[in-house]
Swiss-Prot record:
Species of origin: Cereibacter sphaeroides (strain ATCC 17029 / ATH 2.4.9) (Rhodobacter sphaeroides)
Covalent link location (Pyrroloquinoline quinone (Glu-Tyr)): E16-Y20
Annotated GO biological process: pyrroloquinoline quinone biosynthetic process
UniProt xrefs under InterPro entries: PQQ_synth_PqqA (IPR011725)
Domain of life: Bacteria
HAMAP family assigned: PQQ_syn_PqqA
Keywords recorded for this protein, A-Z: PQQ biosynthesis
UniProt name for this protein: Coenzyme PQQ synthesis protein A
Length: 26
């Protein structure tokens, strides 16, 4: 996770990116 920033930590965009990255990794 290179986008581990406080700004993307409490935003819906960060969660979406996290889910997308998780899905792409699987």
């Amino acid at each position: 996770m290179a986008w581990k920033t406080p700004r993307y930590d409490e935003t819906p965009v960060g969660m979406e990116i996290n889910m997308y990255a998780c899905a792409k990794r699987k």
